[in-house]
């Protein structure tokens, strides 16, 4: 649980704007299909893997359109080189985790973590992006897709506990800056 008091999120809100700039999030001009809904109220972060490598966020967008969705289902996509791409706008209801699409931020990492590992640069970006979302939305909980749905995603080499610890450390580091 990442409750309000624990990291002094109020103080952190002031530095968040600069912190988000550092993340250098890339925006793509997606062509959205019908049915994009606003009104996402994030309380959770849900982590995913793309299950394959060398996929751009545009390719994922096209794949998700072909599934009959309005476009890329995730709010963020992190490539192996650590670059963060915006998917859906944060206020858009996601299409990434059944039962959690209306109250979460979906973050997907490029790769298949059943048989490969998160790159150092991906981990770095993931930790910072997660910390930023926690500060922004006072996120209560972060979990892997498999924690909320019957799936292998985000894979056995995605260590949710390690990531939660790194994010907690990052929030503490930010407070002490």
What are these regions (language model features)?
Residues 1-43, 83-84, 89, 103, ...:
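Basic/polar, cationic surfaces and motifs that engage anionic cell-wall
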Residues 33-90:
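Secreted/periplasmic proteins that engage bacterial cell-wall peptidoglycan
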Residues 48, 108-109:
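Conserved beta-strand segments of the P-loop GTPase G domain that flank and frequently precede/overlap
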Residues 94, 98-101:
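Flexible, solvent-exposed short loops/turns enriched in glycine
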């Amino acid at each position: 649980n990442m409750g309000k008091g624990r990291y002094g999120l109020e103080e952190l809100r002031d530095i968040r704007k600069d912190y988000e700039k550092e993340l250098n999030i890339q925006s793509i001009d997606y062509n959205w299909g019908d049915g994009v809904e606003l009104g996402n109220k994030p309380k959770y972060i849900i982590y995913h893997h793309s299950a394959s490598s060398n996929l751009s966020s545009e390719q994922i967008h096209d794949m998700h359109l072909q599934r009959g969705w309005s476009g890329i289902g995730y709010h963020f996509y992190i490539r192996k080189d650590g670059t963060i791409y915006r998917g859906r706008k944060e206020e858009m209801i996601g299409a990434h985790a059944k039962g959690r699409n209306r109250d979460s931020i979906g973050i997907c990492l490029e790769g298949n973590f059943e048989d490969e590992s998160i790159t150092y640069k991906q981990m770095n970006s993931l930790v910072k992006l997660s910390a930023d979302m926690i500060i922004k939305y006072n996120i209560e909980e972060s979990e892997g897709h498999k924690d909320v749905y019957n799936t292998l995603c985000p894979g056995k080499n995605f260590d949710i506990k390690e990531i939660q610890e790194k994010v907690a450390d990052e929030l503490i580091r930010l407070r002490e800056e």
